[in-house]
């Protein structure tokens, strides 16, 4: 029984983000479709070759996507919303881009499909839309073409296909409501056709992804798996693939399926290998997801070997990444600025392929010398002074319940704040950032590259802050912001100023479409060596008599949008960040800043996949926010901002944050979101976003007034604020001025009654 290895998928964008550049060039009309397709072909060939050279036996094919793999599956099945269809009914790459972006070089623009998080990762997928009586047919043959490409290059191919039940689970019904699971029998013939085509090409194994099997699914959805896979059996061997959590709770459903193998995530799941071996049919192959596909740490391969060695020789076994390597940067070797010790702790996608080769060889031969050598740096890290800061650990251990409580309840604080700020009814403000113009970006880049000295850089930033204050005063806003000209990214900026983080040059991962992010990496205990935001907030406040908000990114969001440590809990990391930022709140307050906003857009998206795990997460997530904020005096007003759409199921936790003011994204839902706050009888102040900053459209005064009147039917007017949905960083100044002028006018009209 020779053990093989494989990956579940590989990053698509290219080491230098070649895919992003090709996409954006094509969208802008600067290159042809053929040039775009050529870049895709070259990237796929390179990535297959790189994996093969790194020692991977079975190469994933079908993991590449022009925008997103769920969207690719929609096209495969012929699921194209009517508004995005070509007039002749054909499907091409522009159809795909219209669904993803709302527009493409050809065809009529139409509202893009909804985008949401892929399970609990920072990757986003385009939500499939389903209508009653919908028809499906094999329409987009990208998978088959890529399999032909890989076979022609002589590769050992393992096609990757998103499974039918998970595909339906990820979608939403549009128009007349019905049970989308009822479409299962309509999509299965397309899957059968695809599997038949793969069998014709001599394919032995197909990786069929059903990550929904790690969720707490309704019984009807669990029951759907057996008939679905009864219909799909027989043409090729199916590797039922799960990830991001364990499968033990749904193992009875899984073991009844007519498949030939199961992939389990042994990094994020709590499945016991011996128990899995005992319960799986003896003729099934087990694919052990031992190498973390969604973090950047080198694996301790001696531990991984010990985890799996007892079942070697007892059943067919493959070793694999826990999930697709899509969530990891590509290649550590090009990072030239990382300290040698720190660099030795990391493994990016290509290094993870090498880890799989080392593990396969050791399991086949029994010789573990290479594993011990590879694991030495990560074992040495446990004792590194770069990791452990006794002062931070001592401070964390000393936290008491008192540290997460404001001195007084909201009613007492609100009175002190009213006396201090004397704001009018319907107070107006913005969420934080103003347009990041070419001048601002060039200024930061020149400083970063060393082409500009610190004095000239500071003079330039001060000028942009001054401009933002002047603009806001001219518009008549009540509570101002400094505009964040000095910040490139709301997480990276704080990470750069906190001890315990490092940054890469090329550690890009895909977020969606052509958007890539370069998350900071938490390498050790986190502390704040010096104030971060105080100087610029103080300068901005010196320019005006109106209150200027201090702007912080909250601890849970910094955690969720970084690569975390694996040797301590997420709770520990969040609370360390909270303590560091608590000192920032105290310093802002001492500098005369009376309103401080702590953004937590990621609080909800950090929720565990299983609802039974939610309470523990929300408890420490809320506590981290409160530790961050509770140092503030009664007359300091704490704001928070959240930009997502589902509050109903976490209202208790949102109220428990005890922020004096919460601003939320509501314009696209026509204030429907406020229902949750009304039903819950939310006690503090709320700023429902009155216009969508993601659109260049300028809302009219009447439209904003109507939304605010609607809001006032649900929330008492004396507790309402007036603000946009989100920060204005991506907008231009002309539409920003026009939209804010209308927003201020609407508030003034309401004050006059």
Swiss-Prot record:
> What keyword terms does UniProt attach to this protein?
Amino-acid biosynthesis, Metal-binding, Methionine biosynthesis, Methyltransferase, Repeat, Transferase, Zinc
Q: How is the cofactor bound?
A: Binds 1 zinc ion per subunit.
Q: What family is reported? A: Belongs to the vitamin-B12 independent methionine synthase family.
* One Gene Ontology term from the biological process aspect of the record: methylation
Identify this protein by name.
5-methyltetrahydropteroyltriglutamate--homocysteine methyltransferase
Cofactor(s) recorded for this entry are: Zn(2+)
Check the record and name the InterPro entries matching this protein. Cbl-indep_Met_Synth_N (IPR013215), Cobalamin-indep_Met_synthase (IPR006276), Met_Synth_C/arc (IPR002629), UROD/MetE-like_sf (IPR038071)
Q: What does this protein do?
A: Catalyzes the transfer of a methyl group from 5-methyltetrahydrofolate to homocysteine resulting in methionine formation.
Active-site residues are 694 (proton donor)
UniProt source species: Escherichia coli O9:H4 (strain HS)
Q: Which GO terms describe its molecular function?
A: 5-methyltetrahydropteroyltriglutamate-homocysteine S-methyltransferase activity; zinc ion binding
């Amino acid at each position: 029984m020779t053990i093989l290895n494989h990956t579940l998928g590989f990053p698509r964008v290219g080491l230098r983000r070649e895919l992003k550049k090709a996409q954006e060039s094509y969208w802008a009309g600067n290159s042809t479709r053929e040039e775009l397709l050529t870049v895709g072909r070259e990237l796929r060939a390179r990535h297959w070759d790189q994996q093969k050279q790194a020692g991977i036996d079975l190469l994933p094919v079908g993991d590449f996507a022009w925008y997103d793999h769920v969207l690719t599956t929609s096209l495969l099945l012929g699921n194209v919303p009517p508004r995005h269809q070509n007039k002749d009914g054909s499907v091409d790459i522009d159809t795909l881009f219209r669904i993803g972006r709302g527009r493409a070089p050809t065809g009529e623009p139409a509202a893009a499909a909804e985008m949401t998080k892929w399970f609990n990762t920072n990757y986003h997928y385009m939500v499939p839309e389903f209508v009653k009586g919908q028809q499906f047919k094999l329409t987009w043959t990208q998978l088959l073409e890529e399999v032909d490409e890989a076979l022609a290059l002589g590769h050992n191919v393992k096609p990757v296909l998103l499974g039918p039940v998970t595909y339906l689970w990820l979608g939403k019904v549009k128009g007349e409501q019905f049970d989308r699971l009822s479409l299962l029998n309509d999509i299965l013939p397309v899957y059968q056709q695809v599997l038949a085509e793969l069998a014709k090409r001599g394919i032995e194994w197909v990786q069929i992804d059903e990550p929904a099997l790690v969720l707490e699914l309704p019984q009807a959805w669990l029951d759907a798996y057996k008939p679905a896979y009864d219909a799909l059996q027989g043409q090729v061997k199916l590797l039922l693939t799960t990830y991001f959590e364990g499968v033990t709770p749904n193992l009875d459903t899984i073991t009844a399926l007519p498949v030939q193998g199961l992939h389990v995530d042994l990094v994020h799941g709590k499945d016991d290998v011996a128990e899995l071996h005992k319960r799986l049919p003896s003729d099934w192959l087990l694919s052990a997801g031992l190498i973390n596909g969604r973090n950047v740490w080198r694996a301790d391969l001696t531990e991984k070997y010990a985890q799996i060695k007892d079942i070697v020789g007892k059943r067919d076994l493959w070793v694999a990444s826990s999930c697709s390597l899509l969530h990891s940067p590509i290649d550590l070797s090009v990072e030239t600025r990382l300290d040698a010790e720190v660099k030795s702790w990391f493994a990016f996608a290509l290094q993870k392929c090498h880890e799989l080769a080392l593990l396969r060889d050791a399991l086949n031969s029994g010789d573990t010398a290479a594993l011990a050598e590879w694991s030495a740096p990560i074992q040495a890290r446990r004792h590194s002074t770069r990791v452990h800061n006794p002062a931070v650990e001592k401070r964390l251990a000393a936290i008491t319940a008192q540290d997460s409580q404001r001195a007084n309840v909201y009613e007492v604080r609100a009175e002190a704040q009213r006396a201090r700020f004397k704001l009018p009814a319907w107070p107006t403000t913005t969420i934080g950032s103003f347009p990041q113009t070419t001048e601002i970006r060039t200024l930061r880049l020149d400083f970063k590259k060393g082409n500009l000295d610190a004095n000239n850089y500071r003079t330039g930033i001060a000028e942009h802050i001054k401009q933002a204050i002047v603009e806001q005063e001219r518009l008549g806003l009540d509570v101002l912001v400094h505009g964040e000209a000095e910040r490139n990214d709301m997480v990276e900026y704080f990470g750069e100023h906190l001890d315990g983080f490092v940054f890469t040059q090329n550690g890009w991962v895909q977020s969606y479409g052509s958007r890539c992010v370069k998350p900071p990496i938490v390498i050790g205990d986190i502390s704040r060596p010096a104030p971060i935001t105080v100087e610029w907030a103080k300068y901005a406040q010196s320019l005006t008599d109106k209150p200027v908000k201090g702007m912080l990114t909250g601890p849970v969001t910094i955690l969720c949008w970084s690569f975390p440590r694996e040797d301590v809990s997420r709770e520990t990391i969040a609370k360390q960040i909270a303590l560091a930022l608590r000192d920032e709140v105290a310093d802002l307050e001492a500098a005369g800043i009376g309103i401080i906003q702590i953004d937590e857009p990621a609080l909800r998206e950090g929720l565990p996949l299983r609802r039974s795990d939610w309470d523990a997460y929300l408890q420490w997530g809320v506590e981290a926010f409160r530790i961050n904020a509770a140092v503030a005096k009664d007359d300091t007003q704490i704001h928070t901002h959240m930009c997502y759409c589902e509050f109903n199921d976490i209202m208790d936790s949102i109220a428990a944050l005890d922020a004096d003011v919460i601003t939320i994204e509501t314009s696209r839902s026509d204030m429907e979101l406020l229902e949750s706050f009304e039903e819950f009888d939310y006690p503090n102040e709320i700023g429902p976003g009155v216009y969508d900053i993601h659109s260049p459209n300028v809302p009219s005064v009447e439209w904003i007034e109507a939304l605010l009147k609607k809001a006032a039917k649900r929330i008492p007017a004396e507790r309402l604020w007036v603000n946009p949905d989100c920060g204005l960083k991506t907008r231009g100044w002309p539409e920003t001025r026009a939209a804010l002028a209308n927003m201020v006018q609407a508030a003034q009209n309401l004050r006059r009654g």
